[in-house]
């Protein structure tokens, strides 16, 4: 939250948007402090004043323009601002490190990611699909391979629910490597029946469901806007995806405690089948991405 406050509620007097579109993620520009001067750099002249008028507009290739502006930065002392950003980033990083090392139940999603990484190592290929689940995955997984960590919902064209087909493609392209899919329980519902395809065509990925029994990002956004007593259509309840996968001929296992995670993963890989490890995680946890998502959808700012 401190990281969000510094970056998006700062007292910055000038903001340089280099090739950045003022779309819904930035509340069409409304998330920028009204007092700030805005410099926009874009190769497309139509973007310069889109959604928010620029105080200074520079039309051109971002790389070329910035290479001309960079020498000017050395003329001013930015050390104070840099330290502010470093402190905010360090605060968030410290929190993530503590949660990865926390073995208590209910399982924190970052702890789940740490356990998966402990098991599969840097030779595996990782895909993260969902809302908060994508954040937890891409910040926690590490792979030595190019494109070894993929978040399906990244950017404007990221598509919820594509984790399963992404994982299938990764396993077909690199059958010798472990392919681990971290799936939210909401995103699991989009293409879960493709486990039938995986069984028939022998595509043994391991899908780990980060199951908080909800559309987590939506639920926590509703808590921010409506309160915990007025949740609408965001609670999913416990669904036994592991049993569905077993019914299709794959391997399934339910996990409810930290010490069960790695043994379950070992059994999943040893089965040689497409596998689903359904892990019940802490339903109260959200990621720093959720407040940003909530702010981006607010129309009163």
Each language-model region and where it sits:
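Flexible, glycine/charged-enriched surface loops at secondary-structure junctions
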Residues: 75-89, 276
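Short, small-residue-biased leader/transition segments that mark boundaries at the very start
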Residues: 1-7
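Thiamine diphosphate
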Residues: 9, 48-59, 63-69, 135-301
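An anion/phosphate-binding loop that grips the pyrophosphate of nucleotide cofactors and donors
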Residues: 12
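Active-site diphosphate/adenylate-binding microenvironment
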Residues: 89-165, 298
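A short helix->loop->beta-strand "cap" motif at the edges of active sites that frequently abuts
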Residues: 34-37
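Short, polar loop motifs at secondary-structure junctions
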Residues: 42-47
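Glycine/threonine-rich flexible loop motifs
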Residues: 22-31, 287-288
């Amino acid at each position: 939250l401190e990281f969000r406050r510094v970056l998006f509620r700062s007292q910055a007097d000038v903001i340089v948007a280099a090739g950045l579109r003022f779309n819904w993620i930035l509340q069409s520009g409304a998330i920028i402090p009204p007092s700030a001067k805005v410099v926009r750099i874009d190769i497309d002249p139509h973007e310069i004043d889109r959604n928010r008028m620029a105080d200074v507009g520079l039309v051109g290739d971002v790389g070329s323009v910035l290479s001309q502006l960079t020498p000017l930065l050395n003329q001013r002392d930015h050390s104070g601002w840099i330290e502010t950003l470093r402190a905010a980033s360090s605060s968030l990083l410290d929190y993530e490190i503590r949660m990865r090392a926390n073995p208590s139940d209910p399982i924190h999603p970052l702890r789940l990611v740490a356990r998966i990484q402990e098991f599969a190592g840097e030779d595996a290929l990782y895909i993260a699909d969902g809302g908060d689940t994508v954040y937890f995955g891409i910040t926690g997984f590490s792979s030595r391979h190019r494109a070894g960590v993929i978040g399906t919902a990244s950017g404007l064209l990221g598509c919820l629910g594509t984790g399963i087909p992404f994982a299938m493609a990764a396993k077909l392209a690199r059958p010798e490597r472990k392919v681990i899919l971290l799936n939210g329980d909401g995103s699991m519902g989009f293409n879960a029946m493709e486990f039938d395809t995986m069984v028939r065509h022998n595509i043994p990925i391991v899908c780990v469901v980060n199951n908080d029994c909800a559309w987590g990002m939506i639920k926590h956004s509703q808590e921010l806007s409506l309160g915990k007593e007025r949740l609408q259509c965001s609670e999913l309840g416990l669904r036994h995806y592991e049993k569905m996968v077993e019914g299709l001929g794959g391997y399934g296992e339910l996990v409810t405690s930290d010490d069960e995670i790695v043994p379950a993963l070992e059994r999943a890989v040893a089965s040689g089948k497409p596998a689903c490890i359904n892990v019940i995680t802490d339903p109260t946890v959200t990621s720093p991405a959720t407040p940003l998502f909530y702010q981006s959808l607010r129309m009163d700012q």
